[in-house]
């Protein structure tokens, strides 16, 4: 209860909490739309929407580190190391809850980069499950177009330019499909809506 009280009394933390919820919804919407764009089976499109909603659920286990300030100067390093584990923590949290392997693998590997530089397993190329490759693109895009405490939201063109500069992280075919998709969408209406496609 002490943790919950501290969170509720901290306006900045509460704003971040709401931002996290919206982030999950936006990633869910984007992942579903990209899956439809590349003509994945409807069941996988739906499962990607589920995975998008839950992809950062492992951060819940990091909440004590995230939301309670500590005087320890090693705190930031510990926090970052713990956050790098959040894909596995999310997988572990959900593995016995009836989710499909497709959903679980998409969540577990959503921070893998196409060139092998990601985490938690340094997978590369098509060894990364397609759901995770889709989430990687959508997660980065949504992060860029969302306002943060330390910067304003980027417009769509700036976000895509940034992603082009980091294109080694993404499956090129999927990224080109995503760029084509974004050109056809109203991002505020189709991705940044507050209700998920589920």
Where are each of the predicted segments found?
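Metal-dependent catalytic cores of enzymes that make or break cyclic nucleotides
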Residues: 3-198
């Amino acid at each position: 209860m002490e943790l919950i009280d501290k969170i509720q009394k901290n306006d900045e933390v509460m704003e971040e909490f709401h931002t996290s919820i919206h982030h999950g919804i936006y990633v869910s919407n984007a992942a579903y739309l990209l899956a439809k764009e590349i003509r994945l089976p409807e069941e996988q499109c739906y499962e990607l929407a589920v995975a998008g909603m839950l992809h950062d659920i492992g951060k819940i286990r990091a909440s004590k580190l995230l939301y309670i300030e500590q005087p320890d100067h090693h705190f930031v390093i510990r926090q970052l190391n713990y956050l790098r584990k959040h894909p596995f923590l999310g997988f572990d949290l959900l593995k016995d809850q009836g989710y499909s392997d497709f959903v679980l693998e998409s969540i577990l590997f959503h921070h893998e980069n196409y060139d092998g530089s990601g985490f938690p397993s340094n997978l590369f190329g098509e060894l990364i499950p397609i759901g995770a490759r889709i989430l990687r693109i959508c997660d980065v895009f949504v992060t860029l177009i969302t306002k943060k405490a330390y910067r304003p939201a980027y417009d769509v063109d700036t976000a895509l330019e940034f992603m082009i500069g980091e294109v080694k992280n993404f499956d090129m075919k999927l990224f080109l499909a995503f760029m084509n998709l974004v050109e056809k969408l109203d991002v505020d209406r189709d991705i940044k809506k507050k209700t998920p496609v589920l």
